[in-house]
Amino acid sequence: MTQCPFTPCADGLILAVRLTPRAGRTGLDGVRTEPDGRPILCLRVAAPPVEGAANAALTAFVAKSLGLRKSEVTLVSGETARTKRLHLSGDPQALAARATAWFGGDGPGS
């Protein structure tokens, strides 16, 4: 199985994402391994990459998928790049369980 594309931190998780904007529909494309060996969650959104629309759609989709408020999902890095890092606020263990159930990866350290 694929490793999880997240790292626990004191107040939540950091989630590594590769985003495809302007897709036919918003959805999950699974977990892939980057050339450097790091796992990354591949997502697509219908919104175009204009004036932050794709990033807003990304955070809203992740929040809805994990049962979080939109304010609990923030973009940490990659504002104009396809590869992004999101901070998910909450209990790291509970978030890890929800995230793993959502995309079907292994837990941290597996």
From Swiss-Prot:
InterPro entries: DUF167, YggU-like_sf. This is UPF0235 protein Mpop_2087. Gene3D superfamilies: YggU-like. It comes from the Bacteria. Belongs to the UPF0235 family. HAMAP family: UPF0235. SUPFAM superfamilies: YggU-like. Transmembrane segments: none annotated. PANTHER family: UPF0235 PROTEIN C15ORF40. GO terms for cellular component: cytoplasm.
